[in-house]
Amino acid sequence: MSDGNTAAAWVPTGSVTVRVPGKVNLYLAVGDRREDGYHELTTIFQAVSLLDEVTVRNADVLSLDIVGEGADKLPTDERNLAWQAAELMAEHVGRAPDVSIMIDKSIPVAGGMAGGSADAAAVLVAMNSLWELNVPRRDLRMLAAQLGSDVPFALHGGTALGTGRGEELATVLSRNTFHWVLAFADGELLTRKVFAELDRLRRAGDPPRLPGPGPVLAALAAGDADQLAPLLGNEMQAAAVSLNPGLRRTLRAGVQAGALAGIVSGSGPTCAFLCPSAAAAVDVGTEVSGVGVCRTVRVASGPVAGARVVPAPTEV
């Protein structure tokens, strides 16, 4: 713990803003339930251009404010992962978490895009910069994994192969830009309930398992959306659709509108549609919006970088 005489020397004034992306799962294979209740996952994440902005300032006490879409649905206390990230980072360096956090949400809430995990990753990066801590990237990843299995990818960004609970990451070569339409269905799907439903379905008759991720990795390396489209797969999709049958209509609407393929992303209820071009994605998004099968539609592209500090505007 630092003493009051030295603290001022290593606490610069001002603020730091970090942009951080949401994610889609292009491939998700789920192992059987382990004794500890978790499932081994093999997944391919891609960070996409729906970004939250997280600003951290020095303050007298820890506080959290949230604006933007769905902000009223989120806690602004210790229940929020961003708050927990501030406490964890401060504990790691032996300080009090005396910062104010402002989150401007563009990643839809409860959309399965790991927006809460993204905000937690952004807080780690912002505090590291604001306090000039120089905590190495390796240690940031360790802290991120303590917060949750999706937090390390929000730091990593790009495209990655995740194993374990999804937190053990290997960078994946992804040439070219892929264009997505993201349709956020009505209703929430709690991840634990989707896993439980998948366990039930497997006991009853075992929905088909995906082949290994090799062909998906090859399509990403080739940068070929037509090659990637038929390979998109999610073993949780059957469980998500079982709990929310309306997802079938959403998936059908996207493909009928011209998407190359559609998939439930992660545990849902987001449906991700791969499109052949940016213009096609706009057309598909417009058509899906008009059909009334979901609450929100967004157009995005990927891969994009993980949590990064926004450069301060230069003085003229």
UniProtKB/Swiss-Prot annotation:
Q: Which GO terms describe its biological process?
A: isopentenyl diphosphate biosynthetic process, methylerythritol 4-phosphate pathway; terpenoid biosynthetic process
Which GO molecular-function terms appear in the entry?
Answer: 4-(cytidine 5'-diphospho)-2-C-methyl-D-erythritol kinase activity; ATP binding
Q: Does the keyword ATP-binding apply?
A: yes
* InterPro entries xrefs: GHMP_kinase_C_dom, GHMP_kinase_C_sf, GHMP_kinase_N_dom, IspE, Ribosomal_Su5_D2-typ_SF, Ribsml_uS5_D2-typ_fold_subgr
Residues the entry annotates as binding ATP = 108-118
Annotated pathway: Isoprenoid biosynthesis; isopentenyl diphosphate biosynthesis via DXP pathway; isopentenyl diphosphate from 1-deoxy-D-xylulose 5-phosphate: step 3/6
- The EC number on file is 2.7.1.148
Q: Which family does it belong to?
A: Belongs to the GHMP kinase family. IspE subfamily.
Could you tell me which HAMAP family the record lists for this protein? IspE
Protein's name according to its UniProt entry? 4-diphosphocytidyl-2-C-methyl-D-erythritol kinase
Q: Which organism is it from?
A: Mycobacterium avium (strain 104)
- Name the lineage: Bacteria, Bacillati, Actinomycetota, Actinomycetes, Mycobacteriales
Point out the gene that encodes the protein: ispE
